[in-house]
């Protein structure tokens, strides 16, 4: 079982200052170990609803974790 979740983070950038943004993490469920982080992509968007919609689409389409970076890249290129 794989799940995709949005997480909030605060980043400080030398030119932009401090800002809130959202990333997406991919976790796999392992019996006896629970949910284990597979990978995460940071600073995808500053729009929580957009991040949640993208994570929901990944979940709905049962995206394999190895495709997470490609999907995020496609999303960012389509903005």
Q: Language-model features: where?
A:
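Low-complexity, intrinsically disordered short peptide segments enriched in small/polar/basic residues
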Residues: 3, 38-41, 69
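Intrinsically disordered, low-complexity acidic regions enriched in Pro/Ser/Thr
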Residues: 16, 36, 76-79
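Compositionally biased, intrinsically disordered linkers/stalks adjacent to structured regions
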Residues: 49-79
